[in-house]
Amino acid sequence: MSGMGIAILCIVRTKIYRITISFDYSTLMSPFFLFLMMPTTLKDGYRMNSQVNEDAIGINLDLSLPTHISPTTGSESASGSNASTLRNDGNALDGGLLRTSAAISAPTGTSQPTETIGEKLSNEERVNSNVSASNSTTAGTGRMLSQSLTNDSPSNEISTDQLKIFQRMDEMSARMIEMEESFNKLSNKIAEQNTMVLNLKQDNYKVMNKLNILLKLVAQPSARPSTNNAQNKLAIELLNSISAVSSAYLQKMQNNGSGRQHTADLCTGDSNTHSGINQHRTTNGTIDVNTNTAQLNNQFSNALNTILPDQQHNRNNVSQNINQSLPNRQLGPVINTQANQNQSQVLIHNTNTHQQVNRSPISFPNASTDKPFKLNPNGIKRRRRNTQSNNNASTNDHASAAQKPISALSPLTNSHNSTTSMNYTNSSIHSGVTSASNSFHDLNSLNNFGTTTALSLPSLALDNASFPPNQNVIPPIINNTQQPLSFSQLINQDSTTSELLPSGKSGVNTNIVNRNRASTLPSYPKPMTVKSNVDDDGYQEDDDDDGDDEGDGRDNEEDSTAEEDEVDDEIETDMKNASINKRRRSLHHKKSNSLNGRRKLHGESATKPNINSDLHYRILKAPTDVKTIWEEYDTGIRGKPSIKHLEAKYGNKWRLNKNKKTFSRRKRLYKFILNGMERGKTAQEMIETLENKRLYKDDEDGEVKKRTIGWLQESLAGI
């Protein structure tokens, strides 16, 4: 037990002194306190002889106020029991305090203080003092000590050390509170920063996901627009337009031909033909294909027998008989699926006609069906000259050519060597029908749509014949699974088929126009009358009218395109114009170069002006960009007149011979830009649209390249 204290009240001469003694358990058990607890021994025999100051009582205790606390090493009692405070109404004692040399030590040294106290007591006995005063004082002191031990509470006074300790503890408490607050603030900041870090991580994750998505989109190669879709769309639109025209035409022909059935039956002159016709009409088109083919072969044989003896006098009658002897063209000679099955019947029914055909002085053009059509995979339109056999096919003038028998008979009369010419295929008949316009050799794939057969048969009397066709026509529907036509095939067949559509009862299409005879090509031994379809704004969509044919696909370099265009467009009408243009080209080769490094050919002389120089203007060949083409059309290049000015001033006269094919291709670009300008866009925007359409990404090396102007013109063929 530490920290125990005893308050001793000392009464000296009416002054009360309170002595506070701090001690521990070891001090309490010392002989000194035992001595204090025994007042009777002092009363009986002991006398104190010391001189006591009136202001102090010597009780052999160190009661002075300590100025410094020096703790004893290894002892807890020495550090806490040396402080005693003596006060007298706030004033210090006058005579000083008696100090004893005895120090209260640890419990291990209790014997030594006992001896010292005994010696001092023996010395005090020798002092001469008043016995009564000594006894009374001693007795009073003992009573006060006993009363203080029993009645007094612990001291209310606080020592300086305790005060310092309390102050230090208050400071430490304040510091601890401040540290706690700081720690709380720090923990809150850490929590906030942790939350912020988590939010930033989430935001970063979201942003990274978005960036990854964008990078994937950017890294993916730009999907080129599929040309097949555009081709299919164009094919569907083309066939829809053809079907609409053909449906209206066939409906009209059926209505007009319903009143002529009786007359057609009377003009045939063949009982077997009458029975076949009646059977077909009663069964609503369910006649057998083999029987119908045999009947048609007999009819053609009779027609040939009628034609061969006297062609010039009997041509009109024979043509009328042939048209009337074909009452039902639904299952005519254009049936392709039954061609091989009916070949033997064709040979049987036409055995007697081969010698007559060989004796025929008429020369029909070859309709070869063995030549396959190869489409250029790049979609660039290529043209070839007709073969020498086609050049030698016709030797008469325009008048005799207009009066020739129908070209549909050419598959029957085209055989001088074998019987294979009697094979009735759709391609051979159709190529014979459309040989004047030089269309494709093989059009079997159009049977998928059921319109070509219906349109090819009425054209038998429209190409060169002078008599109206039989208008009793029922449109057939033949499902033949052939390979569909390509992009450029459908364009040309649209133009070719539209030439064969008559309008009204006259049997002549009002859209078919005869071009100027000066536009016929002098390179052929026989001049050819050119027919073409003219659209609403007056330019020819099909420019195969100068005897060119689709050839094998070649490379789509601009050089080859430019060479073919120049060869096709620079054919002169006579040798004089050819020599003049040759001199002009040589002069321009020496003086000027084109924008793309190629030398251009112009019709204007470099030495002297020509009055009709505008009529001899040549369109710029093989330009590298759309802007140059538009400048040539709108404002003109290098002082030359613009194409728009030439069209407004001369019409089509300036492009009859040289520029007709090039202009027909360029017209697609002109129309595209003009249509955009009508919708509120500028010419520059439309030019940029066309230039962007040329861009594509190469699959091999991944480079972005530009397609040719020829490809761009072909892609706008539907405009």
Swiss-Prot record:
Stretches with biased composition (Low complexity): 128-143
Official protein name in the record: High-osmolarity-induced transcription protein 1
Modified residues (Phosphoserine): 146, 153
Organism in which the protein naturally occurs: Saccharomyces cerevisiae (strain ATCC 204508 / S288c)
Subcellular location: Nucleus
A family per Pfam: GCR1_C
Gene Ontology CC annotation, any one: nucleus
Maturation and modification: Hyperphosphorylated during acute stress.
UniProt biased composition (Basic residues): 581-601
GO terms for biological process, alphabetical: cellular response to osmotic stress; positive regulation of ribosomal protein gene transcription by RNA polymerase II; positive regulation of transcription by RNA polymerase II; RNA polymerase II preinitiation complex assembly
Primary gene name: HOT1
